[in-house]
Amino acid sequence: MPVNNKDINILGIETSCDETSAAVLRNGCELLSHIISSQIKTHQKYGGVVPEVASREHILHLQSVVEQALQEAKMGFGDLAGIAVTYGPGLVGSLLVGVAGAKAMAYGAGIPLLGVNHLEGHIYANFLHNPGLKFPLLALLVSGGHSHLVYFEGHGKYQVLGQTRDDAAGEALDKVARTLGLGYPGGPYIQKAALEGNPHAYEFPRAMLEPGSLDFSFSGVKSAVLNTLNSARMKGETVNVADVAASFQEAIVDVLVRKTLLALARTKAPTLVLAGGVAANTLLRERLTEATQKRGIAFSYPPPILCTDNGAMIATAGYYRYLDKDYAPWNLNAIPGLNLA
């Protein structure tokens, strides 16, 4: 594919947790390549991500993943306008691998380095999938470590309206799935088991917090499920795993939808976008689709491949930083506890 000198080609690199990913994006909307090296099978035997193992895997695979992305895009570093990389939040060792690699590549190629907040990256997956998105909009970001409601007035202009106070939705899903013996990562396993279950078999609590709050809390529902399972075990009773999974999923989705609708009513945002790993949950998509259609609100969500951690979303967020000339300094460092500012 010929390269036009006027094209803005961005290489995106993602290594915040257990996926080593790189993608080449042209002009913010044309994905030329997208490579993901997943570590799920490596970590499954441990029941979760082992940070030291994750960072070693990134070291082993980053160079080849980037080379594959460039080869598939039929480009070299000289064809790139900039290199975008996740610098937080995430596992510090994993982040350092990506940041160090991106800095070396960008410096060697003489092109800008673009630091991307991993959480922003998830939200910007929607701009890749739906380039026609208009502001203002509300974003519901739900992943393994984060649950946020964010109001966007424009690129780089946003306000966090609510966030998790304890366990994020994805974290709760992982812990319950592990206890049920369903496997890792928990979200897809809970969803699959729930298909055969009764979502009203158990009435698990919904933590709405104080009136009007847009924050989330999922530690209570997680604990309620674990207590139910422990109680049954102590009594020698069996539980229907599908019913527990379905009832638990129902409680999680119910809270997410109710809080999101409250935020939409408060902000009067005409558009809602869904992002993060839990955004791949079918029930959550269906409930939000139904609710937004009733209210005349536009609703966008990316395909599952763009919901989990990936380089394409980082390239997309990096593209908009490039347009604003918001380049990262060469002393950019990993910030594992980075928040949405």
From Swiss-Prot:
A single GO CC term for this protein reads:
cytoplasm
One example of the protein's molecular function in GO is:
iron ion binding
Ranges that cross the membrane: none
Q: Where does substrate bind?
A: L141, V142, S143, G144, G145, D174, G187, N281
Q: Which cofactor does it need?
A: Fe(2+)
Question: In which compartments does the protein localize?
Answer: Cytoplasm
Give the cofactor note text: Binds 1 Fe(2+) ion per subunit.
**Annotated EC:** 2.3.1.234
**Per the UniProt entry, what are the Gene Ontology biological process annotations, in alphabetical order?**
tRNA threonylcarbamoyladenosine modification
What chemistry does it catalyse, as a reaction equation?
Answer: L-threonylcarbamoyladenylate + adenosine(37) in tRNA = N(6)-L-threonylcarbamoyladenosine(37) in tRNA + AMP + H(+)
Note the CDD domains from the entry: ASKHA_NBD_TsaD_bac
| Gene3D superfamilies the record matches | 3.30.420.40
Sorted keywords for this record are: Acyltransferase, Cytoplasm, Iron, Metal-binding, Transferase, tRNA processing
EC primary class:
transferase
Task: Locate the residues binding Fe cation.
Answer: H118, H122, D309
The record's family statement is:
Belongs to the KAE1 / TsaD family.
The record describes the protein's role as:
Required for the formation of a threonylcarbamoyl group on adenosine at position 37 (t(6)A37) in tRNAs that read codons beginning with adenine. Is involved in the transfer of the threonylcarbamoyl moiety of threonylcarbamoyl-AMP (TC-AMP) to the N6 group of A37, together with TsaE and TsaB. TsaD likely plays a direct catalytic role in this reaction.
Question: Which HAMAP family does this chain map to?
Answer: TsaD (MF_01445)
Q: What is this protein called?
A: tRNA N6-adenosine threonylcarbamoyltransferase
High-level lineage? Bacteria, Bacillati, Bacillota, Clostridia, Eubacteriales
